[in-house]
Each structure stands twice: as C-alpha cells, then as structure tokens.
Amino acid sequence: MLVSRRLTGARARAPLLASLLEAWCRQGRTTSSYSAFSEPSHVRALVYGNHGDPAKVIQLKNLELTAVEGSDVHVKMLAAPINPSDINMIQGNYGLLPKLPAVGGNEGVGQVIAVGSSVSGLKPGDWVIPANAGLGTWRTEAVFSEEALIGVPKDIPLQSAATLGVNPCTAYRMLVDFEQLQPGDSVIQNASNSGVGQAVIQIASALGLKTINVIRDRPDIKKLTDRLKDLGADYVLTEEELRMPETKNIFKDLPLPRLALNCVGGKSSTELLRHLAPGGTMVTYGGMAKQPVTASVSMLIFKDLKLRGFWLSQWKKNHSPDEFKELILILCNLIRQGQLTAPAWSGIPLQDYQQALEASMKPFVSLKQILTM
C-alpha cells in the first residue's frame, strides 16, 4: 500500500534497601533531593538500584522530600512519558547513565510549588520540564535545582508539554542542522510512527518540506497510515514497498530527498541511502534493529553520501542553555499554531507503572505511555 497526501489537506492532530538511597543522598544532590525512609509517604517514585529488565528492577518507593533552600525548586510532577531512551537507560544501554539507585524518567512536565530565596526565573504555578536527561521524572514530587529546569508556557496541552523536551527537539534539530533544505525539498525517514517520526512529519510540513515515511508492516497498517497522513505525511509506505521498483514513481512528483533520518539501522538504513540524492546526508539517531548501518563503497564514492549521527544530550553540551530554551519556544509556537501535536498517547497512573512499562516495550507500539501523577 502506497499512500500519498497533499500538504494542503487536513491535519488532525528486586527490593532496594533504604540505606542505598540514603547513601545516594549523602553523595551529593546533583539533580534531585530525595532520600528514602521506611514509613509510607505521599511522595512516591519509580526507583531502580541496578540495571536490567525494567519490569524486574523498577520499584515504586516512598521517598522523603527535603527542605527547599537557596536555588531549590519544589516541583509537583504532573505527567511523564516512557521513552525508548528511558528503557535503555534502565537496561544500562545508553550513553548517559545516572548513579544508582536512580529514579527513572528523562522527560515530563511538573508545576512549581515553592522556590528558594535565590530563585529568580521561576515562581509557584509555573510549568517546568527537565533541562537535561537523567533528572528522574517518574515521581510525584521532587526538589530540583533551578538550573535543572526550564519553564514552559501553560497555554499548551499538558501532554504536549510532557513530551516536548526530547522527541520534538530531536526532530527539529535534525531537520535544520544537517542540510540547508528549502520549501519543496523532501526528507525520507524510517520508524515514522515513533515519537520522533511523528514530530518530523509535522515540523517538516510546517517548514514546507515533503516527507517520505517508512514503517514496518503490521495488522493495523491502514489505521496507522491514516494517522500519519492526518499529521501531514505526504507518502507512507512499508519497508517492503520501499524495495519495490514502483517506488521510483514517487520521485516523479518530488525531488530526491537530500536528508534521510534513520532510527532503525540494518537493511532499513541501507534502503534509505539508496534513495538519497547525490551529496545527501543520512542522520542516525537510533538503532531499533540492533544491526549496524551499512553503506556500500559506491554509495560513498559515486554518490558522495554523508553519514552523521545525532544525540540531543550531546547537542545540549555543545550549546548554551539559552539556545535550548529558544528551541523550546520555537516548538511551543508550533504547538499553539496547531502545527505540532503530541503523539497518540495513553495516560497510566503512576501506581500502574508495570502496565505502562509492558505496553511501551511491546512490538508495534502505537500509543505513547504517559505516567500521570
């Protein structure tokens, strides 16, 4: 099934010891200020003390909230998604690993409850998101340092704010940082139904770019295809269809893509390279297939293709906090204008985290699992 859509169409939019956690707090508070205690508390968090299967190592723990001082900010978490990077971090397969024990979650939105005397950029009532990965958002409350947070406007949907700081940021940076694309140019991507993939479709459309979106075949293929079209996808095809000779007919109506976005690797990434324009760039930001990216010598010599990688955490290290805040504001404007919506999602109460973890790790995941506090 090969589906096209014009840009002018409609857009819808096992146990942990308390002493371990106490030792964690004694090590110094780099991102948060929780310690464990034995009696029940209204402050709860999903904690892991070693790396492994999230379903086995994650536990719902009662934690103690420390006093707010100086540059501290007391935050009540509102919602936090479960992303692939969260799972990889818990498994120990990620480029950034917090000290153990740790609270899970890299992304989410919370509301400021109180601030310390030295806090100048935030006030009670403000919405905030993490400035960097590893903050530990799967909890009901926390005391963070002001520099660990970024304020976001409250006039955007809660689920959009909760999923703002990772996937849309990754999508935007990949679209604008590697090739100087102009309206009418095209982009090809795999894993198009992922959080990043859905953001790519919408942001590209807002920039006047056309998208060729590759997905794995599945039982509900038409439902998924229709949803991606509603987001603004120009073409949606399966991995198998991408290999068919008929695919070349797409390029009668649009130029060969100069940018490919790869989250899969293996044969899928090789197919993306095959359809790139000479001199084009493939950016790899994930490896779902757990297979290497392979490029033939002829692709590199005769087509002069470029292979790059992108990791948002590294981008943040290379850029100032103000530049990240500017990026967040750009994306918030797109949300306000109806040009960027949150991925299809399912809200799960924090205490039902096992259900959310299981759902997020199933094949052909169609709904983003968001923990609600």
UniProtKB/Swiss-Prot annotation:
Transit peptide, start-end: 1-53
SUPFAM superfamilies: GroES-like, NAD(P)-binding Rossmann-fold domains
Transmembrane segments: none
Biological process (GO), any one: ceramide biosynthetic process
EC number(s) on file: 1.3.1.104
Keyword Chloroplast tagged: no
Keyword Acetylation (UniProt): yes
Record-linked InterPro entries: ADH-like_C, ADH-like_N, GroES-like_sf, Mito_Enoyl-ACP_Reductase, NAD(P)-bd_dom_sf, PKS_ER
Catalytic machinery residues: Y94 (proton donor)
Function, as annotated: Catalyzes the NADPH-dependent reduction of trans-2-enoyl thioesters in mitochondrial fatty acid synthesis (fatty acid synthesis type II). Fatty acid chain elongation in mitochondria uses acyl carrier protein (ACP) as an acyl group carrier, but the enzyme accepts both ACP and CoA thioesters as substrates in vitro. Displays a preference for medium-chain over short- and long-chain substrates. May provide the octanoyl chain used for lipoic acid biosynthesis, regulating protein lipoylation and mitochondrial respiratory activity particularly in Purkinje cells.
Quaternary structure, from the entry: Homodimer.
Family: Belongs to the zinc-containing alcohol dehydrogenase family. Quinone oxidoreductase subfamily.
Descriptive protein name: Enoyl-[acyl-carrier-protein] reductase, mitochondrial
Naturally occurring in which organism (per UniProt): Rattus norvegicus
